[in-house]
UniProtKB/Swiss-Prot annotation:
GO molecular function: structural constituent of ribosome
Cellular compartment(s): Plastid, Chloroplast
Keyword Ribonucleoprotein: yes
NCBIfam families assigned to the protein according to its UniProt record, in alphabetical order: rplS_bact
Keyword vocabulary terms for this entry: Chloroplast, Plastid, Ribonucleoprotein, Ribosomal protein
GO biological process: translation
Location (main, coarse): plastid
Name of the protein described by the UniProt record: Large ribosomal subunit protein bL19c
Amino acid sequence: MLTTEVLLKVKDSQKKLDRPKISVGDIVTVKVLIKEGSKERLQQYEGTVISKKSQDIITIRRIFQGIGIEYVFALSTPQVLSITIKRHSKIKRSKLYFLRNRVGKRAELKNKIVSITA
């Protein structure tokens, strides 16, 4: 068996199928398991998804005390425990890097109205 076949089998076995469909512009909360020495704790990150790469890596941006902070998460890692989508936004770009230069209300995105089918 080739090493590439082995790597593909391992990657498929670790793939998490219960992830919600995340798109750029969504406001999400990501819960991450952090190990510090012998202790483990759960930390929660919330922000706007400004980029998405190959269904696996997302970049989340939020403003904290007037400073923009960006987190990059690989969604297939076992440290990412859960992802919840708070809100969808209406956008027309695949990357939202222009939000880095905006401050205040100009950095907000328009809400997308999601219809509920009965």
